[in-house]
UniProtKB/Swiss-Prot annotation:
Name of the protein described by the UniProt record: L-lactate dehydrogenase B chain
HAMAP family: Lactate_dehydrog
CDD domains for the chain: LDH_1
GO molecular function, one term: L-lactate dehydrogenase activity
Alphabetized InterPro entries for the sequence: L-lactate/malate_DH, L-lactate_DH, L-lactate_DH_AS, Lactate/malate_DH_C, Lactate/malate_DH_N, Lactate_DH/Glyco_Ohase_4_C, NAD(P)-bd_dom_sf
Assembly description: Homotetramer.
Positions annotated as active site in the UniProt record: H193 (proton acceptor)
Intracellular or extracellular location(s): Cytoplasm
Organism: Pelodiscus sinensis japonicus (Chinese soft-shelled turtle)
Name of encoding gene: LDHB
UniProt keyword annotation of Oxidoreductase present: yes
Major localization class: cytoplasm
Listed EC numbers: 1.1.1.27
Length: 333
């Protein structure tokens, strides 16, 4: 006897079983779920996979999102602690790891998270060998390097979320001070996503007008308007939010979706993300730092040769040295 489905639907041809734009988020903590909802809100995938070691939390998050699928463009949301569920992913977003504690430097997190990655990354490659990996876990620059080493992927397919959020914070804070919209205020934070990041004051502009030409002391200790404080606020902002609410999640989630949109839609937009910088600006070691990079459907396709002042280059090299001093001691990569 025919089922209700058979009575209702007459099949014409077998549907596709392989997703076109499958995205996986590894880690369903505060950051992972903020990434997931931001990706879904932009309609960037036809299938979303969630992975975590906490089964009840994982199932609960999956069900909660599934119940909202009527209001989304993505109806297939799956989850499992087994990374097999990630098979055929186009992008894998890695947010897994131990959480940064109040007052803890991102660099202090490194060894605990390296051990987590040694399990996750080989599994990702087993099930999605053609994927691009976007690393979000902190310290993001070192863990992007770790991912690159463990995955065996070419460097254009391993990207760190890097200073995309730092630059957004920078533009927001400057725009507030100037009374204009952040999209009209252009500025870049490069280097480490963290305490040694570099504010490129020489490139800050509004409508093409260099702010440093209007105020040559901008970003220095001699500046009566104390614009240097804006960069300090960028560096301290994550610590401030963690102090107030215990973690950061919404801004990084939105930032990650912004990066994925450039990839999925082949937009060729320029983002400050973490990439392998050996040979650039006199950096001699294999470190990942944020530089302005073009993101397209092929991954991270090129780096913009931003004209930096000597002191900015020196800061960038110092940022590289800071990371290498920890990276060089990592074992089993």
């Amino acid at each position: 006897m025919a089922t209700l489905q058979e009575k209702l639907i007459t099949p014409i041809v077998a549907g596709s079983t392989t997703p076109n734009n499958k995205i996986t988020v590894v880690g369903v903590g505060q950051v992972g779920m903020a990434c997931a909802i931001s990706i879904l809100g932009k309609g960037l995938c036809d299938e979303l996979a969630l992975v975590d070691v906490l089964e009840d939390k994982l199932k609960g998050e999956m069900m909660d999102l599934q119940h909202g699928s009527l209001f989304l463009q993505t109806h297939k949301i799956v989850a499992d602690k087994d990374l097999r569920v990630t098979a055929n992913s186009k992008i894998v977003v890695v947010t897994a790891g131990v959480r940064q504690q109040e007052g803890e430097s991102r660099l202090n997190l490194v060894q605990r998270n390296v051990n987590v990655f040694k399990f996750i990354i080989p599994q990702i490659m087993k099930y999605s060998p053609n994927c691009t990996i976007l690393v979000v876990s902190n310290p993001v620059d070192i863990l992007t390097y770790v991912t690159w080493k463990l995955s065996g992927l070419p460097k254009h397919r391993v990207i760190g979320s890097g200073c995309n959020l730092d630059s957004a914070r920078f533009r927001h804070l400057m725009a507030e001070k100037l009374g204009i919209h952040p999209t009209s205020c252009h500025g870049w934070i490069l280097g480490e996503h963290g305490d040694s990041s570099v504010a490129v004051w020489s490139g800050v502009n509004v409508a093409g007008v260099s702010l440093q030409e209007l105020n040559p002391a901008m970003g220095t200790d001699k500046d009566s308007e104390n614009w240097k404080e804006v960069h300090k606020m960028v560096v301290d902002s994550a610590y401030e939010v963690i102090k107030l609410k215990g973690y950061t999640n919404w801004a990084i989630g939105l930032s990650v979706a912004d990066l994925i949109e450039s990839y999925v839609k082949n937009l060729c937009r320029v983002h400050p993300v973490s990439t392998m910088v050996k040979g650039m600006y006199g950096i001699e070691n294999e470190v990942f730092l944020s530089l302005p990079c073009v993101l397209s459907a092929s991954g991270l396709t090129s780096v913009i040769n931003q004209k930096l002042k000597d002191e900015e280059v020196a800061q960038l090299r110092k940022s590289a040295d800071t990371l290498w001093s920890i990276q060089k001691d990592l074992k089993d990569l």
